[in-house]
């Protein structure tokens, strides 16, 4: 029985391991690197592929309606800024109400926030600085006054 010394002086048997190579093929296809199941990627050969959802976010602002795709792991406020939408904010940590909005359709995860109480969340209020989309969502923005009224 073949043994190989390992750390701390223990021996590990490798006799059960197959010594002949097994046929296998791993390739990166152009179709996969340009999009898989409708998900947008920017993969290069050797990159690790991680699939995440992206949702349509519609913001109803005093200046009109803005719509964009937002990854499920990015805060709505952050991605809105990335695509050029100016929204109110202050703390960026979910501990004030400057970025308050109201969800009128869809769902968000705002478990990172600490400012809103359960009643406010049930009424549909959201802090865009700590809210991830979990479905396509419509949010009325600039609702700080409604929240504090």
From Swiss-Prot:
Residues 1-52 form a transit peptide. Its cofactor is [2Fe-2S] cluster. Pfam families: Fer2. It comes from the Eukaryota. GO terms for molecular function: 2 iron, 2 sulfur cluster binding; electron transfer activity; metal ion binding. InterPro entries: 2Fe-2S_ferredoxin-like_sf (IPR036010), 2Fe-2S_ferredoxin-type (IPR001041), 2Fe2S_fd_BS (IPR006058), Beta-grasp_dom_sf (IPR012675), Fd_pln (IPR010241). [2Fe-2S] cluster binds at residues 91, 96, 99, 129. Keywords: 2Fe-2S, Chloroplast, Electron transport, Iron, Iron-sulfur, Metal-binding, Plastid, Transit peptide, Transport. Its main location: plastid. It is found in: Plastid, Chloroplast. Binds 1 [2Fe-2S] cluster. Residues 55-145 form the 2Fe-2S ferredoxin-type domain. GO terms for cellular component: chloroplast stroma. One of its GO terms (biological process) is electron transport chain. The keyword Iron applies. The keyword Iron applies. Ferredoxins are iron-sulfur proteins that transfer electrons in a wide variety of metabolic reactions. Belongs to the 2Fe2S plant-type ferredoxin family. Forms a complex with heterodimeric ferredoxin-thioredoxin reductase (FTR) and thioredoxin. This is Ferredoxin-1, chloroplastic.
